[in-house]
Amino acid sequence: MTSSRRRFGFTLVELLVVIAIIGILIGLLLPAVQAAREAARRMQCTNNLKQLGLSAQNFHDVHNHIPPIAQNNSKFSRVSWLVMILPYVEQSAAWNEFASGGNLRLSTAGNPSSSRTDAKVDPYKAAPWEWDIACWYVSMPAKICPSDPSGADSAAQWFPGRTNYRASLGDATIASCYFGPDGKKSRGPFCVDNGGETRDFSYITDGTSNTLMFAEVPTHATTGGSDDKTLNIKTGILTGKNPQWASTCVGFQDPNDVNSFVSSVVTRPWLGRRWADGMYIYSSFNTVLPPNSVHCIYSTSDAERSIVTPGSYHSGGVNVSFCDGSVRFISETIDCGDSSANNDDYRGKGGKSPYGVWGAIGTANAGETDITL
């Protein structure tokens, strides 16, 4: 008697069908997984801005003024608002290093254990542009947006440390902090401490819920590749007398990529570098051009007037915090008014912003209280 053995298993066709189904499922699920990850990163970015806003309020409670955007006085080196709030973002150790001075210099960039005993730093005088200062390499999650792919802090000379968060100058374009009187021309809540020049919350007559405090700006990416935004800064746009320099900046924008300049433009990789430096090109932003668009500076010097535009790796807009501590997501299509307006007509003066709703939420006391976002 002949017995037959029945075999169980997939035929080649069945196996290919199963593989195809699995591939389709992965294709359907992967975007959802990526979207969930980005949502988590965006939420963390929001929390970072909330923490920075709370730290600024705590600083105000202790010192009776908003942290200066930069220091330009006999006590401090040219440090930024981020340095001043270190004790309020759980970074007292880094602040104490900066405040006490001593053996802060490193023989190996980014290696705090490589301190040099032959080169001391005076208290409060560590220079924010020097790569070999130990406290500039503090690990501070609140200064980095997790969606930014730029990687670890830079240890390059002149560019130690990075940050995604900046303080508001409003719609003013002003020269850098060590030029003294220009520090008073900020139309936002921040100003430069030129030896006693400070602002408190009473300065914000437009309302703390209507006035920006912080926003994110992508760092100059080092990864390369298709996800790498061109985040350089166009230099030398005002070699002549051209008051419409916001529209001049837009004129160099790549028509196929609003984040980039046309290839002939000379740029500098300054965005997101030197988190401890109070110079405006490193520490602040302006509400002049739409979020996620280009950046320009008056000349080839990082000390000159600049337009730094908030932007992000979040799709469609940018996270910002207001002076009341709230955080919102602002669309890159927000009303930005007239980019051809002469910025000199508003810099350091009163009057409503010519740059639409975007400019209005940048000003602190321009009589712009009826704002709808």
Predicted regions and their residues:
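N-terminal secretory signal peptides that target proteins for export/translocation
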Residues: 1-5
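Internal low-complexity, small-residue/proline-rich segments
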Residues: 35-373
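N-terminal single-pass transmembrane signal-anchor helix
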Residues: 7-41, 45, 51
